[in-house]
Amino acid sequence: MLSWVVTFLVVALIAGILGFGGIAGASIEIAKVIFFIAVVLFLISAVVGLARGRTRV
């Protein structure tokens, strides 16, 4: 249990450093780009799957 506490403490400290630094704005833009790429890839794979006759998405 103590290892989980230490792990979350480290993650929280890194998030705090990145959030209060100037990197947060750049991270948001990168996350937006990755999100839209993932949505486009999902839609392409769904259309290709439906075109092949598979019903699972």
Curated annotation (Swiss-Prot):
Q: Name one GO cellular component term.
A: plasma membrane
InterPro entries this protein is in? DUF1328
Localization, UniProt:
Cell membrane
Q: Name one Pfam family in it.
A: DUF1328
Tell me the keywords, alphabetical order.
Answer: Cell membrane, Membrane, Transmembrane, Transmembrane helix
Q: Does the keyword Magnesium apply?
A: no
Membrane topology category: Multi-pass membrane protein
**UniProt keyword DNA damage present:** no
Where is this chain primarily localised? membrane
Q: Which residue ranges traverse the bilayer? A: 4-24, 30-50
Which family does this protein fall into?
Belongs to the UPF0391 family.
What is the name attached to this protein's record?
UPF0391 membrane protein RPD_3366
Q: Which organism is it from?
A: Rhodopseudomonas palustris (strain BisB5)
